[in-house]
Each structure stands twice: as structure tokens, then as C-alpha cells.
């Protein structure tokens, strides 16, 4: 961390070409594991958004006009700056986000990979020639930058889920205004500003404005922002989509999930349970792709539940500043109350808690619940906590029906030794991503990522899909001589 003798460069500030005083005041940066104050971040307001938009609009035209190789070089250099500081990024992820250290290092690594992949997008072919029914006419469709992109990023994977929009948007010639969540304003904001600034990003091209919902609302409402890329809850995503629709503003929404982990009777049970534990309890279940519904065939359900409960009981929950824990804290007290209410509601409705179901402060034990029915809230809700609800099915048709009864459609996993059967089931799921003999928390930066239904607006991040998201199509036609029209 670059510091003066007293404090880091970002202390109490926001990044808008340079580090400047925030018009919205300041907020504490808090460690969710113990409540310690780690620092102070600036808090933006609507005036900061307006100033950033004006600067971004001016800078974007020049940024888009420079050779693609120069834009790509800056993004790659920023990636190398991240690599140099990966342990610092990981440390902040632990202290700010409640992550265990391996999660922090993984996130720094995949963000680094994402940045290099995004830099490569700038050099991909940028246009398609189409034939014409008009003699002598040439039709060219090319991709051009959207303009100014507003990125509203979440707290759970603050670095990666910001970077998957920021890096490709910049590489493709856009200016970016990033609003990180206040709960992770350093990992998902200040440090990102530092690495791009150190890499030589021109003034005005990138702005980082930590803030609350009011800042997001100002970004959505500002006509100078041409696109909003939002990752977060479906509830908030619906509001953003509605407002962007009224303004005819491009929007990319990556929203919630209530993902299924389907286990057929022929599955490798140990493998299915191993995948289930990772896919449910990673980062305390605070992952949009986490396995939120375990659909298990009756023939193996009891064995599966017992094996998963045993794994859950062996997971150590505690302060992530120690390397000896598997699960850290939930992000805030509100989330603890919400998770526990879902567990208690399931118990009252007849479900059986085989492991966990208890908490102390923000630390929630890995929990396994048996006999969960589709009408229970724990089945219908995105839990965002370390809870594995198990629902029994008797046939493949029933499993597919149970999987598809949710409004969400983000990710799924299927366990079977018959790959053809797994593929057939995958094709019938209303789900954007399906992983056979794995778990649903999967992401590779070069592969299109996104969901169906209430899990998003239908767009995708990753590889060539990012070009579709962060550019727009322009048709140019040419003829050597003007046509002689009848009037």
C-alpha cells in the first residue's frame, strides 16, 4: 500500500483523475470479523458523479482514438501492478470482506487473468462485411465503444466482480465510473484506482466513487453515462433495469441465483459430497453461484446427507486472519439474522437440521438441512449463507421440475456417471451455466458467464461476449458513386 507517514493515499478520498476530497463525507472501513476500524474511505455523492461524468465524457473520445495496442498495454501493465501487490489485495479481502486467505489470493489471481484476457479483446477483429443487393455497395458492421460505462460492483467478490466489467470496458475504448460497495471500498475500489493510475491511465478515463444507493441512483439517472453494468441482488437489479429502460440506456444485469446441485443414484457419492461442500460453504455461502438447493435421489439421499453433515461439522469457523479456518464471518449482522430466520423457518415447517444451525456474533456454522420441501422459504430463497437444504426426488423428471420451479436461472451442477444423461438434463434446465460432475461455483474469464430468468438481463461477461456488452454495433455502407433516385 502506498502511504504517507500517516495514512494511505486514498484515506478519506475518492478517485476522480486524482485523489480528491469526497463531497459526501467519509465512512469507516470495518473488519466484519471483529468490528475493528481499518481506515476511512471517502463517500461520493451526486455532485461527485456529475463531475466524474463530465471529465469522463471529455477523456473517453481521446482514449478511444488512441491505438488499441496502447490501451491494451495500459490494462496489461495494471494487471502486472496487481500481481506485484497480490498479497496486499488478498490481505484487504480478508480484513474487509471476511474472506479466508485462499479466497483472497484466488480472487487476485483470477482478476489478474481477467485483465490480461480483457486486454486481448482490443486486438480482436472489429467488423464484419455483409453482402448487398445494391450493385457496388459495401456493407460494414463494426463495434464501437458505448462511451461512459457506470459499473456498480458488489461486496462479496469485490475485486473480481468489479474488474470483469472495468477491464474489458476500458480495453475496448470506454471511460469507466466505478462504484464499489462501501463495505469493500478498498479491495473493490481504492486499490483498483491505484493500479490503473500507476499503470499510466490517462486522466479522466477511470473514476472510483465509493458510496451508497444514492450514488448508484445518481449514476443510473445521469444521461452522460451511456451504460450501467450492475452486479447484485435481483430486487435492486429490477429497479435499475426499469430506470435504464425508461432512459433507453444500455444495461447489463448480473443478479441473484438459487442454484441446484442434482445428485442422481449412480453418482460418485464421495465426489458429489466434496463438490457440494465446496459449492455451498465457500466464502460462507456468500456467492451468487453457490449451491442453494441440493436435489438428491431418494436411493442415496440419506447417505448423502450424512456425509455432507459430517463434512460440515468438521469445518472450522472463525477469524479469517488465522490460516486455520475454513469459514469466516458473514458480512454484517443483517445477513446473520436473515440466514438464521430461514433455517428456523425450515425447522418449524418440519425440516431436520443435521449440522450447524447456530451462530455466534457474525460467525454462522456450516449447516445441513434434510427433508426440505419446495414450499419452504429456505428452498425458494437465495440464502447467501453457509446452508445446504436437501430435497429428495424420485425421478429425473421430478428433479428437472424442481430445478426449474425457481425464478432464478444462474448456475447448476449435476452428478452422474452417465454423461449422456447429465447432458440431457443440462439441456432441459432453465439455467445459464451447468457443470456436470462439478459444483456450480465455476468461472473462467474467457468463457461467457451469465444466467437466465431473474438471474440477469440475458447478457454475458467473458471472452468475446464482453465485446457485445461493452460496445455497440455501427453499420457503414459505401458506394463509389451516388445513386440516381427518382426524386
UniProtKB/Swiss-Prot annotation:
<feature type="binding site">
    <location>
        <begin position="232"/>
        <end position="237"/>
    </location>
    <ligand>
        <name>NAD(+)</name>
    </ligand>
</feature>
<dbReference type="GO" id="GO:0018479">
    <property type="term" value="F:benzaldehyde dehydrogenase (NAD+) activity"/>
</dbReference>
<keyword id="KW-0560">Oxidoreductase</keyword>
<feature type="active site">
    <location>
        <position position="254"/>
    </location>
</feature>
<dbReference type="GO" id="GO:0009056">
    <property type="term" value="P:catabolic process"/>
</dbReference>
<dbReference type="InterPro" id="IPR016163">
    <property type="entry name" value="Ald_DH_C"/>
</dbReference>
<keyword id="KW-0520">NAD</keyword>
<keyword id="KW-0058">Aromatic hydrocarbons catabolism</keyword>
<keyword id="KW-0614">Plasmid</keyword>
<comment type="similarity">
    <text>Belongs to the aldehyde dehydrogenase family.</text>
</comment>
<dbReference type="Pfam" id="PF00171">
    <property type="entry name" value="Aldedh"/>
</dbReference>
<feature type="active site">
    <location>
        <position position="288"/>
    </location>
</feature>
<dbReference type="InterPro" id="IPR016160">
    <property type="entry name" value="Ald_DH_CS_CYS"/>
</dbReference>
<protein>
    <recommendedName>
        <fullName>Benzaldehyde dehydrogenase [NAD(+)]</fullName>
        <ecNumber>1.2.1.28</ecNumber>
    </recommendedName>
</protein>
<dbReference type="InterPro" id="IPR016161">
    <property type="entry name" value="Ald_DH/histidinol_DH"/>
</dbReference>
<comment type="subunit">
    <text>Homotetramer.</text>
</comment>
<dbReference type="InterPro" id="IPR016162">
    <property type="entry name" value="Ald_DH_N"/>
</dbReference>
<dbReference type="InterPro" id="IPR029510">
    <property type="entry name" value="Ald_DH_CS_GLU"/>
</dbReference>
<dbReference type="InterPro" id="IPR015590">
    <property type="entry name" value="Aldehyde_DH_dom"/>
</dbReference>
Amino acid at each position: 500500500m502506498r502511504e504517507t507517514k500517516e495514512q494511505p493515499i486514498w484515506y478519506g478520498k475518492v478517485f476522480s483523475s486524482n485523489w480528491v476530497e469526497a463531497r459526501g463525507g467519509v465512512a469507516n472501513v470495518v473488519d466484519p470479523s471483529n468490528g475493528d476500524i481499518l481506515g476511512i474511505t471517502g463517500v461520493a455523492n451526486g455532485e461527485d458523479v456529475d463531475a466524474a461524468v463530465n471529465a469522463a465524457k471529455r477523456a473517453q473520445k481521446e482514449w478511444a482514438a488512441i491505438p488499441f495496442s496502447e490501451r491494451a498495454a495500459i490494462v496489461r501493465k495494471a494487471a502486472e501492478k496487481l500481481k506485484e501487490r497480490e498479497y496486499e489485495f488478498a490481505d484487504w479481502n480478508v480484513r474487509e470482506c471476511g474472506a479466508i486467505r485462499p479466497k483472497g489470493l484466488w480472487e487476485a489471481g483470477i482478476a489478474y487473468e481477467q485483465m490480461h484476457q480483457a486486454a486481448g479483446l482490443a486486438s480482436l477483429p472489429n467488423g464484419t462485411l455483409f453482402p448487398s443487393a445494391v450493385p457496388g455497395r459495401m456493407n460494414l458492421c463494426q463495434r464501437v465503444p458505448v462511451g461512459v460505462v457506470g459499473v456498480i460492483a458488489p461486496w462479496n467478490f469485490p475485486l473480481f466482480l468489479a474488474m470483469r466489467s472495468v477491464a474489458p470496458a476500458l480495453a475496448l475504448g470506454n471511460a469507466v465510473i466505478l462504484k464499489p460497495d462501501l463495505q469493500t471500498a478498498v479491495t473493490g475500489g481504492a486499490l483498483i484506482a491505484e493500479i490503473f493510475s500507476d499503470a499510466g491511465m490517462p486522466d479522466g478515463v477511470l473514476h472510483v466513487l465509493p458510496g451508497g444507493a444514492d450514488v448508484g441512483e445518481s449514476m443510473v439517472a445521469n444521461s452522460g453515462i451511456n451504460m450501467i453494468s450492475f452486479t447484485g441482488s435481483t430486487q435492486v437489479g429490477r429497479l435499475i433495469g426499469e430506470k435504464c429502460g425508461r432512459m433507453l440506456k444500455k444495461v447489463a444485469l448480473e443478479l441473484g441465483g438459487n442454484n441446484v446441485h442434482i445428485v442422481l443414484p449412480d453418482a460418485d457419492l464421495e465426489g458429489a459430497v466434496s463438490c457440494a461442500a465446496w459449492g455451498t460453504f465457500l466464502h460462507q455461502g456468500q456467492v451468487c453461484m453457490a449451491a442453494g438447493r441440493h436435489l438428491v435421489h431418494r436411493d442415496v439421499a440419506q447417505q448423502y446427507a450424512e456425509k455432507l453433515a459430517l463434512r460440515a461439522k468438521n469445518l472450522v469457523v472463525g477469524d479469517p486472519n488465522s490460516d486455520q479456518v475454513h469459514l469466516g464471518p458473514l458480512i454484517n449482522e443483517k445477513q446473520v439474522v436473515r440466514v438464521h430466520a430461514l433455517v428456523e423457518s425450515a425447522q418449524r415447517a418440519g425440516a431436520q437440521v443435521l449440522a450447524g444451525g447456530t451462530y455466534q456474533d457474525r460467525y454462522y456454522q456450516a449447516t445441513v438441512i434434510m427433508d426440505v420441501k419446495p414450499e419452504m422459504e429456505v428452498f425458494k430463497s437465495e440464502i447467501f449463507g453457509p446452508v445446504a437444504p436437501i430435497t429428495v426426488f424420485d425421478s429425473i423428471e421430478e428433479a428437472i421440475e424442481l430445478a426449474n420451479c425457481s425464478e432464478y436461472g444462474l448456475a447448476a451442477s449435476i452428478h452422474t456417471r452417465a454423461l449422456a444423461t447429465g447432458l440431457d438434463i443440462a439441456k432441459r434446465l432453465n439455467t445459464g451455466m451447468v457443470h456436470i460432475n462439478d459444483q456450480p461455483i465455476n468461472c473462467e474469464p474467457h468463457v461467457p458467464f451469465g444466467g437466465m430468468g431473474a438471474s440477469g438481463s440475458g447478457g454475458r461477461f467473458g471472452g468475446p461476449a464482453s465485446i457485445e456488452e461493452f460496445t455497440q454495433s455501427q453499420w457503414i455502407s459505401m458506394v463509389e458513386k451516388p445513386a440516381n433516385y427518382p426524386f
